A protein has these predicted regions:
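Active-site/ligand-binding surface loops and adjacent short beta/alpha elements
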Residues: 157-159, 163-241
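Extended, loop-rich substrate-binding clefts of extracytoplasmic carbohydrate-active enzymes
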Residues: 33, 82-141
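Asparagine-centered strand-capping/turn motif at beta-strand->loop junctions
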Residues: 51, 138, 148-154, 290
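Intrinsically disordered, low-complexity Pro/Gly/Ser/Thr-rich segments with frequent PxxP/GP/PP motifs
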Residues: 270-283
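Beta-strand-rich N-terminal accessory domains
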Residues: 2-76, 216-239, 280-302
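Plant-skewed but cross-kingdom recognition/interaction modules and surfaces
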Residues: 97, 235-253
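Short, basic/aromatic beta-hairpin or loop at an interaction surface
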Residues: 253-264
């Protein structure tokens, strides 16, 4: 998906975050995998998410019943190849104690803010100065929202591609349908990025699938028939979307049967790189909620 320079901001899982106290300080600092520090954020109803300061990866999002709505591989190790996901997930992010105000941001019951500034070491990898701010928030209905802001702090123009990599927990991949991408063009990653048009009503899974859908709508639905729920993905500022499942193909950081329990629907901006002039800022919003399958679109209430 573009050259290595353009992949600077691609992440694994759900991206990077930084911690800031909310009104009732609903977070806990503790140790996670490999002794790395992680932050657990809770809202007044007991819903939560957790993030690692190294790489800032969101590794858990739980509803009030304690059910995790994100997928975590049994072999997760917070590592991965740079060319696929950029270097920001291999950096320690800092707490943004005084972030600039966010316009048109969904209201939240708990949130944290992170910041990452390019270092001298980073400039040797990608020679452009930037400031990346990220807010991760829980909404009143339990929805999870990630708001990314990237500012060009350099004296020259630069361009980049961008992507989040959420893996959603599902009952059984063979029972999953992805809706909202019908009649769109996509690049098939398993066929040398050959371009096709999807004429199906929805996407189902019976083998390995890796597609980059182009110019996608702002809402995509993942229907889990066994659990009778629908995961609703909403996005702004990310025109494309990746749909992926490894099926039974060997992947370094996946267990043998892990493929059955997740689906990746990833908001990305890769077909047309983002261009920022000095001082300009780009913003993207990613929001995910869970609703009962079959409810009317006007009356659906997230039950995360």
């Amino acid at each position: 998906m573009g050259n290595k320079a353009n992949l600077i901001f691609l992440w694994a899982m759900l991206v990077s975050v930084v911690v800031m106290a909310t009104r009732h300080r609903p977070f806990q600092r503790t140790k996670g995998i490999n002794g790395l520090e992680k932050i657990i954020v809770r809202d007044p109803r007991g819903r939560s998410f957790e993030v690692y300061l190294y790489g800032g990866q969101v590794t858990s999002w739980k509803n009030e019943k304690g059910e995790d709505l994100l997928f975590m591989s049994t072999k997760y190790a917070n590592t991965g190849p740079l060319p696929s996901h950029g270097f920001v997930r291999q950096r320690f992010w800092k707490i943004d104690a005084n972030p600039p105000p966010l316009s048109s941001h969904p209201s939240s019951t708990a949130h944290i803010d992170l910041i990452l500034k390019s270092s001298e070491a980073d400039l040797k990898i990608w020679p452009h100065k930037f400031v990346y701010r990220l807010r991760v928030a829980l909404g009143h209905g339990g929805d999870l929202t990630l708001t990314s802001r990237i500012r060009n702090s350099d004296v020259k123009l630069f361009n980049f591609t961008f992507g989040l990599h959420p893996y959603f927990s599902v009952s059984d991949i063979s029972q999953i349908q992805v809706e909202g991408l019908q009649n769109l063009d996509y690049l098939d990653q398993l066929k040398n990025r050959t371009r096709f048009t999807d004429h199906g009503k929805f996407i189902t899974f019976n083998s390995q699938l890796a597609r980059l859908y182009l110019r996608t709508p702002n809402k995509i639905r993942i229907m889990d028939h066994k659990k009778k729920k629908t995961i609703v993905v909403r996005k702004e500022g990310q025109a494309d979307a990746v749909v992926w499942n490894s099926w039974d193909k060997k992947v370094v950081d996946l267990g043998v049967e892990d493929y059955r329990r997740f689906v990746a629907v990833e908001p990305v901006e890769v077909e047309k790189p983002i261009i920022l002039k000095p001082g300009q800022e780009w913003k993207a919003i990613f929001q995910v909620s869970v609703v009962p399958s079959g409810c009317s679109r006007k009356s659906c209430i997230p039950h995360t």
